[in-house]
Regions:
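Hydrophobic transmembrane alpha-helical segments in integral membrane proteins
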Residues: 1-23
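Membrane-embedded alpha-helical bundles of multi-pass integral membrane proteins
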Residues: 16-23, 27-29, 41-196, 201-204, ...
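Membrane-proximal N-terminal segments immediately preceding the first transmembrane helix
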Residues: 1, 36-43
Length: 223
């Protein structure tokens, strides 16, 4: 019988390592192979399409802020940020920044999703994984905003549990999932969906977000 403990252990304990391994391996493989589709996909962003310009600009900048917020918010040791802010101040800052960047990312990804499904040229050149990831991103950002709202209503201990779980994953702490075993289901869906995005990300055109700047830097250094 599949128990809640088994599901928590699998999705919050093992899945992160599977997803991060696939992501890292995929990034390395695509970098070495230097797949032309990475650079070709970036040409879609040079366009007179207003929805594309606004959508891509909002999404790219906002999602970078979201990612930065997650990295700093979840992985910065408590003893370090306690030098200049309390845990409660950190939570309020996370709510504020998460709301702003999340809302901007939601508008941006919505414009891109509409364009991907309505533009015949984009439709013809897109693969199934490209559609899957934009839908997953739309779901992820929506869940993230929902999580932000829940954070305003939940206890500080619940918020800190996320931090302890994330840091436990990175230091290979056994049973780190127990920190968030009783967390709201929306948090867990947000986490699982995020790792699903990690798994398929290297195989989609969104690789240009990382690879185009990296390949440009490599080529510039060689010259």
């Amino acid at each position: 019988m599949i128990t809640a403990e088994y599901l928590n252990n699998f999705f919050l304990g093992y899945l992160p390592y599977v997803a991060l391994t696939v992501l890292a391996t995929g990034l390395i493989y695509r970098t070495i192979r230097r797949n032309n589709t990475i650079q070709a996909s970036s040409s879609q962003f040079i366009s007179n399409d207003k929805s594309l310009r606004w959508g891509s600009t909002l999404f790219h900048y906002a999602i970078l802020l979201v990612l930065l917020g997650h990295i700093l918010g979840l992985l910065t040791p408590e003893w370090l940020y306690n030098w200049f802010m309390t845990n409660e101040t950190k939570r309020l800052l996370a709510i504020l920044m998460g709301s702003i960047s999340g809302a901007a990312a939601l508008v941006g990804i919505t414009l891109l999703v509409v364009r991907r499904f309505s533009n015949k040229r984009v439709w013809a050149t897109s693969k199934i994984q490209d559609y899957v990831i934009v839908v997953l991103l739309l779901v992820q950002i929506s869940l993230g905003l929902w999580c932000t709202y829940i954070t305003t209503q939940s206890s500080l201990e619940d918020y800190m549990g996320m931090e302890y779980w994330a840091q436990g994953i990175f230091i290979f702490e056994p049973d780190s999932w127990k920190y968030i075993a009783d967390a709201d289901l929306i948090y867990k869906l947000h986490i699982v969906n995020g790792f699903l995005i990690f798994i398929i990300f290297p195989f989609t055109k969104l690789m240009h977000m990382i690879m185009v700047p990296v390949l440009y830097a490599i080529d510039h250094f060689r010259k």
